[in-house]
Amino acid sequence: MGKIKSEGDGEVQEYIDVCDMAVGMSRMIGGKVLPSERPGHMMIEQWNPIGSMGVISAFNFPCAVAGWNTAIGLICGNTMIWKGNESTSLVTVAVGKIVTDVLKKNGFNSVFTICQGTGSEVGEKFLHDKRLGLVSFTGSTKTGRHVAREVSGRFGKTILELGGNNAAVVMPDADLDMVLKGSVFAAAGTCGQRCTTLRRLLVHDSVFDKLAQRMASAYKTIKIGDPLDPSTLVGPLHKAH
């Protein structure tokens, strides 16, 4: 999608780290043991798998978002179908092959499947298929509303990670060096195409002018270009809009 190499490397590492975390969590999924009003009896509350779940991920994190969903979903005992974004299909295929090979080597066949296609062709089928007890969607708020409405209409469950309008608050005693460094990357990283992208700075009057001058100077140093060049911060936009 044009992401710079360091961000791409970080995304793969995030998938690995999530898998490590999920392994630990797999031994922590328990229920409650409750006392009963009947002498000599106890009540047990136990979590059970949903069954099959569908994962629809976005273009901006084509690897990591799938990792969060699949790693946690699998250790909860679910099977899943993952539809990556149609514009990052090579990532979906590559990650899917690696994960499938690892699962097969450990005796887990046919628990993880990928499928390709557009939202209207494939995604809509996820929303209406009653065999998918849960649909996890990452994308725009507008589409998220549609997903929630359609899946809840058949009494399915949803996990929605949608767009944001994020702000940073800068108080008079803030470390401006840290604000500058963090804000520039938060706003310009991934070409500003993240749900967590910084869109607004709420700055106290006493430091506004000083921060504005430093921010303008910092933006002039941002290198736009080849995402494989280590000095590049902003690669090509994914889409013009």
Where are these regions (language model features)?
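Short histidine/acidic/glycine/proline-rich micro-motifs that form metal-
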Residues: 3-5, 86-89, 201
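ALDH superfamily catalytic-core signature
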Residues: 142-241
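N-terminal Rossmann-like NAD(P)+-binding subdomain of aldehyde/semialdehyde dehydrogenases
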Residues: 1-41, 234, 238
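Short loop-to-helix capping motifs
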Residues: 3-4, 129, 140, 204
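Structural signal for hydrophobic packing residues in well-ordered secondary-structure cores
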Residues: 1, 16, 22-30, 96-99, ...
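A generic "alpha-helical surface" signal
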Residues: 10-13, 17, 64, 90, ...
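Rossmann-like NAD(P) dinucleotide-binding subdomain of oxidoreductase/dehydrogenase enzymes
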Residues: 21, 31-178
